[in-house]
Amino acid sequence: MSLYIGLMSGTSMDGIDAALLELPSNHLIHGITKQYSDDVRRNLDDLIMGNHLTLASICQLNTLIGREFAEAVRQLLSEIKVHPKEIQAIGSHGQTVCHDTSGNIPYTLQLGCGHTISSLTGITVVADFRTRDLVNGGQGAPFAPLYHQQIFSKVNESVAVVNIGGIANVTFIAKNQMTRGWDIGPGNCLMDAWIYKNKGALFDKSGVWASQGEVIYPLLEYLLQDPFFHLDSPKSIGKEYFSLSWLQKHLKPDYTPADIQATLLALTAHTIAETILNESGEIKQLYLCGGGAHNTHLKENLARLLPGIAVKSIAELGISPDYLEAMMFAWLAAQTINQIPVNLTSITGAKGIAILGAVYPIIKSY
């Protein structure tokens, strides 16, 4: 038995998820979510929305996020009375602030200094996972299908897993076939940004506000024409693309805020449903994870759009929908530490197998 910690803050930026994972059983021992401090959250919002930050401010933010990730580790271990020396390594995703693979020079950047995390926790850290995939010819995202494949390794039927974070991504798993996956489009990011702008809330709990509005179908149809939705897979996208500025250029003065929220939820539901239906009726089970798995109104919309397909939370399998991505980065850290390459060729379009991440080691004294 080996213990690894995974750290994840997704494009929703709703906090740092920390998961203590037992391998090789993939058993989640404990998980917590630590909210970002107000200053860090404000600076992240400014950076991702394209507001001006100095280079010095970005460098400081990299260190500050590293400190907050380290504090999440300390809180996690304190709650269950586990000593840092018992942990083999931490897998830290960091906080994505930009990700674009559309040009001749693809790039991705996750903040959260690995040296800071390792020094403050006394635990070896693996970070900067996505850059290796980009260099290897891949899209750098999504990685979730790798871990979904582990969970459904004994699958006897075709299933789909959709992770609904800020960006939604899909995994298709079938017996005796290569696992496939890609980014679908906006998951929670537009709904979160819109409710924050109008109500000051971080997210629309259970989709209640969206349920009070009416879908603006001309707006929905216009949004669905965005070129990203019509790209062939593999494909990936960042939250900075599907931003409020992307939305607001399509809005009219007579649209009500609640109706816009209803339309944004419909956009997420329709793009997910279309992705599933394009699998030619093979899929009979759809499992949801990420924050969107708790959005009751979104799940109801998906069930309506996907007749004959059981739409479930991955919690029905005894797996936490909130900590699945953090668990994945704990697992990825173990692959890196043990020099085990991963195969993303059918997911990100990478040219071959690779060992992901950069290692920030700590010399343990016993």
From Swiss-Prot:
The keyword Cell membrane does not apply. InterPro entries: Anhydro_N_Ac-Mur_kinase, ATPase_NBD. Pathway: Amino-sugar metabolism; 1,6-anhydro-N-acetylmuramate degradation; Cell wall biogenesis; peptidoglycan recycling. Signal peptide: none annotated. Belongs to the anhydro-N-acetylmuramic acid kinase family. One of its GO terms (biological process) is amino sugar metabolic process. It catalyses: 1,6-anhydro-N-acetyl-beta-muramate + ATP + H2O = N-acetyl-D-muramate 6-phosphate + ADP + H(+). It comes from Legionella pneumophila subsp. pneumophila (strain Philadelphia 1 / ATCC 33152 / DSM 7513). Keywords: ATP-binding, Carbohydrate metabolism, Kinase, Nucleotide-binding, Transferase. This is Anhydro-N-acetylmuramic acid kinase. Catalyzes the specific phosphorylation of 1,6-anhydro-N-acetylmuramic acid (anhMurNAc) with the simultaneous cleavage of the 1,6-anhydro ring, generating MurNAc-6-P. Is required for the utilization of anhMurNAc either imported from the medium or derived from its own cell wall murein, and thus plays a role in cell wall recycling. Pfam families: AnmK (PF03702). Its EC number is 2.7.1.170. The keyword Nucleotide-binding applies. ATP binds at residues 10-17. GO terms for molecular function: ATP binding; kinase activity; phosphotransferase activity, alcohol group as acceptor. It comes from the Bacteria. NCBIfam families: PRK09585.1-3.
